[in-house]
Amino acid sequence: MAGDKEIRNKIASVKNTQKITGAMEMVAASKMRRAQLRMNSSLSYAKSMRKVIGHIALGELEYHHAYLEEREISRVGYIVISSDRGLCGGLNINLFKPLVAAMKKHSEANVEVDLAVIGSKAATFFNGLGANVVAQNSGLGDAPSVNDLIGSVKIMLDAYDEGKIDRLFIVNNKFISTMVQEPTISQLLPLPKAEGDKEVASDSWDYIYEGEAKDILDSLLVRYVESQVYQGVVENLACEQVSRMIAMKSATDNAGDMIDELQLVANKARQSAITQELSEICSGAAAV
């Protein structure tokens, strides 16, 4: 059995770790709330823009934008959003698994894959895997902006415009609740038809557009893709913080259990030492 001093040193060390994980849990909770606010604001903006796009696209039947037209697939692109830091449980690896499976299916169908990765964890993983990473971005911090993402998004949009890729997807964690974060792969281009497009087209519309509908649609579609990527980043950030909060809470609780176990061992060691001393005293008294 370890000595009393050694056990007490271990208890002190675990208590220090418990303080750190407890502080990290509180910081993650605070950051999660801020990320949720950004996520909700961005979602409302993206939904409104999608309605406008649906209205204009259905109103201009003679104009067929490339972002709205299906084409034969020989190469696809994925924008992968991960965290920059660890200590967030299995958040990143659970996101990468379905993408790796999708890449395997593409390979079997002789469809090539290009990746644009956002977040150092995705960059490290897919570069190590030998994937074709055409763009990477990291170090966005806790308050990313759309401007931070434009470069990576433009590379993929240019590839789509030039016919180098025929379909574009976004891969990120979807924030369902504080207890559920779901890895998702969603199609960005060609823009999937929304359920409410027909209703939007038939409803009364109170907007007056300045300029040609074609020019507005060209601009809006690019902004919409950028907003979807930004939405994915802030949503993934909220998932990262809630996962870190849960991981740190678990670590704090485990530290508490370990302290209790070590305290029990320390008490037993002390009891054993006292019993031995009493036995020696009794033996000495009997000898006299």
Swiss-Prot record:
PROSITE patterns: ATPASE_GAMMA (PS00153)
Protein's organism: Psychromonas ingrahamii (strain DSM 17664 / CCUG 51855 / 37)
Keywords: ATP synthesis, Cell inner membrane, Cell membrane, CF(1), Hydrogen ion transport, Ion transport, Membrane, Transport
Main localization of the protein described in the UniProt heading: membrane
Gene that produces this protein: atpG
Chain ranges passing through the membrane: none
The keyword DNA-binding is annotated on this UniProt entry: no
Its membrane topology: Peripheral membrane protein
UniProt GO BP: proton motive force-driven plasma membrane ATP synthesis
CDD domains, alphabetized: F1-ATPase_gamma (cd12151)
Function, as annotated: Produces ATP from ADP in the presence of a proton gradient across the membrane. The gamma chain is believed to be important in regulating ATPase activity and the flow of protons through the CF(0) complex.
Subcellular location(s) of the protein: Cell inner membrane
GO cellular component entries: plasma membrane; proton-transporting ATP synthase complex
Protein known as: ATP synthase gamma chain
Listed SUPFAM superfamilies: ATP synthase (F1-ATPase), gamma subunit
